[in-house]
Amino acid sequence: MNRREFVSGMAALGSAVVLDGIPGAQTPPPSVDFSLPRKADFAIPAGETYINSAYVHPMPNAGREALRRYVESRTSPVLDTHYDREHVKAEFAALINAKPSEISYVPNTSTGENLVVNGLRIVGTDANVVTDALHFDGALLHLGELKRRSGLDVRIVMPRDWRIDLKDLERVIDRKTRLVEISHVAMTNGFQHDLKAVCDLAHSRGAYVYADIIQAAGNTPIDVRASGVDFAACSTFKWLMGDFGLGFLYVKEELLDRVLRQTQYGYYQAAAMQTHFLPGDEPGAAPYSWKLSPDATGRFEVGTSGSGAQHVLEETLPYIRKIGVEKIHAHRQPLLKRLREEMPRLGFASITPPESTSAITSFTMKDRANVVERLKKANVNVRVAEDFLRVSPSVFNDMGDIEKLLEALS
């Protein structure tokens, strides 16, 4: 499919039908071919092999064009702010089987996590939080500071064989556990929690579950209803193919009023706002009156969010859903299998559980400087940490990219 066919397919969004019964969530017509891999949809320079989407995912061409149009509108004397911010939320909601009313914008994943922990009013009580060492390091810093500053009881389960055993979680979750906080897919090695099993365990002991889904949303099927997860958050610059400064927070509808306390306030939470001091205003006891929106927006959004990123997501979220998350998930499995077979033969031992199907696979590494030099010479981009190497293929990668990586390390 050429670029014109792609753009035409995306332009058809305006006339598409509602998908999955969720208002505002639409999909292009089924005649558009979205087979994988999709190299032509991305402007990755010729000769460069990028297998590092768990770090930052490249924008597809349609997203880049949307951002260009937005930037042009910002330089115009007549500002065009035309975009449907609620439609973008509906698209994300459909991606994880949530209701749009359960979704709010946040600047990033960490803000979402802070809103949940603060809203549950855990600090200053005898309650505890359970997490694990494969959770996002920024979240572990957050919980560690709460422990240091306020004495919060934080219980961290350590991995065994590079996975978190549900039985180890079971040993530390008790009736005083207020929150179980995990990454659905671990950023370090791609370990995947069985989200439903974790939720069933936590709920059986009266605890809630927060999941960081940044390394899963857009590449791994997520069903918040089926899993029972209470809260989830992610930024959009990774597998949602968006940009920095914008993310989503999911809060289960029945917990909005009953459990999660509102901890910040701002005008974006108002469903209606009325002045009472201007000419022609109705009289009032105060200069302003307002009604808060009853949904997640009315609880957690404070002010303006990243408009440029929202424009990008207007293109990328329908793009992801048209390809199909299940197809994205299936596409990478032969690539992961090849890596896990060949990398150990080259001296890179796997630290990803063999049953993992996530988009991340990692390997131990010696002589970092030599590895960096080899990859640089071959124009291959993967994450090289101090003592491990992480590979994360996406929709534009194929077996040729994997072979180029293997050749560079041979």
Question: Across the structure, where does each feature detected by a protein language model lie?
Answer:
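Twin-arginine (Tat) signal peptide motif
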Residues: 1-7
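Pyridoxal 5′-phosphate
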Residues: 7-410
